[in-house]
Design a protein with these regions (language model features):
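Short, flexible active-site loop motifs that bind/organize anionic cofactors or intermediates
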Residues: 12, 25, 202
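C-terminal lid/capping helical subdomain adjacent to the catalytic/cofactor pocket in oxidative enzymes
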Residues: 5, 46, 62-64
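Generic alpha-helical secondary structure signal
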Residues: 6, 20, 37, 191-198
Length: 229
C-alpha cells in the first residue's frame, strides 16, 4: 500500500498521533507490516512492533538463494553407462515421457500455489492470515519449486525455448530470494541496514514481478511443443 509521508502527516492530528488509528485511516502498514516501526516513530510513540515472520523469511530466503545457486552452478547428474546401473533408474525421471509429464504438471501446480501471495496482497476480500506469514509461505513454495525443477529437468537448461523457460524460472527465483532477504532486513525498523534494504527492496520486488510475465507464455509454448512437435 503506497501512502506518502505528506498524507500521513496530514492525518496525524485527526488520528491523535495514534499509530493504529493512523493505519486504519490511511491503510499504511496494513499490507506487509514492515513499516509499522516507522509509523510508530512518526507518531512519536515507542516502537513496540516486532516484525512478524522476519526471521523465518530471512532463513528461507537464504535457503532459496543457495538452492538457486546450486541450480545454476551444479553440474547435472551424469548419465548411466549401463541399464543395470542405479543411475539408469534415476534417469527415467528425465527420459520417460509419462514421468516427465507428471513432474512437469506437479511443478506447475506448486508454482501456482505459491502465487496465492498475490491474492493476499492485491485483493481486499482475501485477508486470511497476516501478509508476513504469506510471504514466508511464498518463499517456502519457491524452494519446493526448485526441488521439483530438479526432479523435472535434472538441472539441465536445455536449448532454445527450454533454455529460456528454465532461465526465466531460475532468474525469477533468484530475484525472489534476494527480495525476501532484503524484506526481512527491512523489517528490522530504522537501523542502517533496514534503511538500505528499504531503499533497494522495491526495485528487486518490481523486477521479480516483471520477470514473471513472460513465464506463462514460455510455459504455454513449452507444453504445446511437447504434444505437437
Amino acid at each position: 500500500m503506497s501512502v506518502s509521508k505528506g498524507t500521513l502527516v496530514a492525518c496525524l492530528a485527526k488520528c491523535k498521533h495514534d499509530p493504529k488509528l493512523l493505519a486504519d485511516e490511511t491503510s499504511a502498514s496494513t499490507v506487509c507490516g514492515s513499516c509499522e516501526p516507522l509509523l510508530e516513530e512518526l507518531c512519536g510513540a515507542t516502537t513496540t512492533s516486532k516484525p512478524k515472520g522476519a526471521r523465518s523469511l530471512l532463513i528461507f530466503s537464504i535457503v532459496a538463494l543457495v538452492a538457486v545457486l546450486i541450480t545454476i552452478f551444479a553440474p547435472p547428474p551424469g548419465m548411466a553407462d549401463s541399464v543395470e546401473s542405479w543411475r539408469y533408474r534415476v534417469e527415467q525421471f528425465w527420459r520417460d515421457g509419462v514421468i516427465k509429464q507428471i513432474t512437469g504438471y506437479s511443478l506447475m501446480g506448486i508454482f501456482l500455489i505459491g502465487l496465492l501471495l498475490s491474492l493476499r496482497k492485491r485483493f481486499k476480500w482475501f485477508r486470511f492470515g497476516h501478509f508476513a506469514y504469506w510471504r514466508v509461505f511464498h518463499t517456502v513454495f519457491g524452494i519446493i519449486s526448485l526441488i521439483a525443477l530438479f526432479v523435472h529437468t535434472g538441472f539441465r537448461f536445455g536449448y532454445n525455448l527450454n533454455f529460456w523457460l528454465m532461465f526465466t524460472f531460475v532468474a525469477l527465483n533468484l530475484l525472489g530470494a534476494a527480495a525476501g532477504i532484503f524484506a526481512a532486513i527491512e523489517s528490522a525498523g530504522t537501523t542502517q541496514a533496514a534503511l538500505f534494504a528499504r531503499r533497494f527492496r522495491p526495485a528487486l520486488t518490481y523486477a521479480h514481478l516483471v520477470l514473471f510475465w513472460p513465464l506463462p507464455v514460455l510455459l504455454t509454448f513449452h507444453i504445446l511443443s511437447v504434444y505437437f512437435y
